[in-house]
């Protein structure tokens, strides 16, 4: 009797284990992996289910879905001329991935630029100035950076308006945020040859939700997107383009 009970208990445990690893849960036919959500397969299903979760298409999509570079300079230039329409297509592709609607206002006011350096793949950006009010002295800006793309190093100096002070928050992806203020940070990403030398040697990785501010008025700074691209909000004093100074004197906005 005892022997039969032990055999039944063992068989029951085996069946429960098999059910768990084949993904049968209280949610119906969904697998453990799909029910658990992104990045939690093995924790929810147990180590024996690792292969099951790795082979599950939904789980693999959730774990691996990251935006990556799709366009290069071969797409962005034709006979040496910057193709703004292609650059906009690239930006819209990134927006679609991140679930950012392309609004009528964006269609009207959004711009893309290679800053005249002929290397949009690596040095360039898209953006919208939501507001730039000289009377009340405030500015709101969306920064769009494709994977690996950098804004040329620059500073904002005083004109008839005060020197621009600014803050940034990452909405999607992440960026290297560089400043000339602070000690040199090791293991910096390579700066594109088309940009040339930089003054800003201190940087931090700025992730989604992180808010950083310009460390000092009129100091040089720039940001570079990571391999997933980035969408960044900027808030600042009034932006006077006459006060914009690039390290690379060939660059212009």
Where do the model's predicted regions map?
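A short beta-loop-beta micro-motif enriched in histidine and acidic residues
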Residues: 130-140, 153-166, 219
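Secreted, short cysteine-rich peptides and small extracellular cysteine-rich domains stabilized by multiple disulfide
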Residues: 31-63
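A short, N-terminal "cap"/entry segment at the start of jelly-roll beta-barrel domains
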Residues: 64-139, 193-194
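Bacterial N-terminal signal peptides that target proteins for export
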Residues: 1-10
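Short beta-strand His + acidic residue motifs that chelate non-heme Fe in jelly-roll/DSBH
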Residues: 152-154, 160, 177-178, 213-214, ...
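N-terminal Sec signal peptide cleavage junction
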Residues: 21-24
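Double-stranded beta-helix
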Residues: 182-199, 220-253
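Glycine- and acidic-residue-biased ligand/ion/polar-headgroup-sensing regions
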Residues: 146-147, 163-185
């Amino acid at each position: 009797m005892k022997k039969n009970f032990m055999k039944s208990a063992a068989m029951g445990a085996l069946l429960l284990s098999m059910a768990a690893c084949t993904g049968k849960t209280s949610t119906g036919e969904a697998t453990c992996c799909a029910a658990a959500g992104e990045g939690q397969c093995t924790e929810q299903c147990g180590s024996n289910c690792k292969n099951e979760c790795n082979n599950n298409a939904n789980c693999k999509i959730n774990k691996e879905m990251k935006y990556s570079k799709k366009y290069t300079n071969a797409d962005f230039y034709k006979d040496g001329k910057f193709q703004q329409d292609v650059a906009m297509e690239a930006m819209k592709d990134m927006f679609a991935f991140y679930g950012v609607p392309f609004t009528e206002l964006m269609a009207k006011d959004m711009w893309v630029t290679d800053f005249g350096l002929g290397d949009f793949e690596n040095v360039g950006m898209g953006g919208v100035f939501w507001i730039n009010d000289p009377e009340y002295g405030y500015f709101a800006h969306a920064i769009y950076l494709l994977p690996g793309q950098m804004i040329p190093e620059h500073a904002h100096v005083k004109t008839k308006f005060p020197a621009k002070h600014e803050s940034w928050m990452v909405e999607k992806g992440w960026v290297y945020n560089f400043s000339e203020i602070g000690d040199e940070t090791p293991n910096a990403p390579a700066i594109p040859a088309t940009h040339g030398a930089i003054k800003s040697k201190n940087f931090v990785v700025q992730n989604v939700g992180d808010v950083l501010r310009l460390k000092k008025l009129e100091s040089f700074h720039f940001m570079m997107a990571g391999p997933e691209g980035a969408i960044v909000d900027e808030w600042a004093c009034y932006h006077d383009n006459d006060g914009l100074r690039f390290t690379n004197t060939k660059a212009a906005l």
